[in-house]
């Protein structure tokens, strides 16, 4: 067990890593393309020509924005640092793998939360009322951590090619968007679709967004949504740590 002083020291190191990631990767090509442009155009392709309420649209856009932005930073970091050999210096530093990964997650979380403010502000501008702001904020922060940890799993592949990791992550992320209630409410899906939706963490964030906006019914109880995101976060973080511990020697 680590003492309080050691935990604080590791947290400071994680924050230093996050600061480095923010400076280097926020304007990285794959992050901008897969984190901002792709979900933006995907959303426009869905909504143009359809008569949908602004509350429904903003809730779906917000969920998709947090999902894509938070899963776009962490997959880029490990392969890029493998290619540039920066990972060797990091591995030689007095820092644990868990701390290094947590630093990457923090950078991704900040990015996801910052970009998520855009659809929120757009919604408020167009008359959307946020009836449960605390629940919405909690859901966004928890989901940003969850999706960032999910991105770490993609980056555990021992490769220096960012394109390989982003291709794999895209193959997972796109199907999740279409089964998670972003475009079609979970309650309108067939029984097998609802079963699949329950396996996606994005479903629970979208459900919280629907609950937080005026006149939109959510499919699951709020407590279930929050608990599900927390459970997915723990599973993703534990799996990512184990996978990176195994793949690190192959990167050096």
Name each model feature, range by range.
Residues 2-38:
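Aromatic- and glycine-rich beta-strand/loop motifs that create alpha-glucan
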Residues 9-17, 182-224:
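Short hydrophobic, aromatic-rich alpha-helical segments embedded in or entering the lipid bilayer
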Residues 24-71, 170-177, 230-236:
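Hydrophobic alpha-helical transmembrane segments of multi-pass membrane transport/permease proteins
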Residues 39, 44-47, 130-131, 207-252:
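Alpha-helical transmembrane segments of multi-pass membrane transporters/translocases
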Residues 48-80, 138-156, 182, 188, ...:
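Hydrophobic alpha-helical transmembrane segments of membrane proteins
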Residues 55-123, 170, 177:
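Hydrophobic alpha-helical transmembrane segments of multi-pass membrane transport proteins
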Residues 97-98, 102-169, 219-230, 234-241:
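Alpha-helical transmembrane segments and their short interhelical loops
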């Amino acid at each position: 067990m680590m003492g309080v002083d050691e935990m604080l020291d590791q947290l400071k190191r994680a924050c230093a890593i996050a600061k480095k990631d923010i400076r280097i990767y926020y304007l990285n090509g794959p992050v901008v393309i897969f984190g901002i442009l792709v979900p933006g155009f995907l959303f426009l392709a869905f909504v143009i020509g359809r008569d949908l309420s602004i509350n429904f649209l903003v809730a779906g856009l917000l969920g998709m924005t947090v999902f894509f932005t938070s899963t776009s930073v962490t997959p880029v970091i490990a392969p890029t640092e493998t290619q540039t050999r920066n990972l060797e210096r990091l591995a030689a530093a007095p820092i644990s793998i868990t701390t290094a990964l947590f630093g990457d997650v923090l950078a991704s979380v900040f990015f996801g939360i910052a970009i998520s403010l855009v659809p929120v502000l757009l919604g408020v501008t167009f008359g959307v009322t946020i009836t449960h702001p605390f629940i919405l904020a909690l859901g966004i922060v928890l989901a940003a951590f969850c999706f960032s940890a999910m991105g770490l799993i993609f980056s555990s592949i021992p490769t220096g090619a960012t394109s390989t990791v982003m291709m794999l992550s895209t193959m997972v992320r796109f199907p999740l968007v279409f089964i998670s209630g972003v475009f079609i409410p979970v309650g309108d899906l067939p029984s097998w679709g609802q079963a699949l939706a329950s396996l996606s963490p994005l479903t629970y964030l979208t459900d919280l967004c629907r609950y937080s906006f005026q006149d939109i019914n959510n499919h699951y109880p709020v407590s279930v949504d929050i608990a599900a995101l927390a459970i997915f976060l723990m599973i993703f973080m534990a799996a990512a740590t184990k996978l990176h511990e195994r793949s690190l020697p192959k990167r050096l």
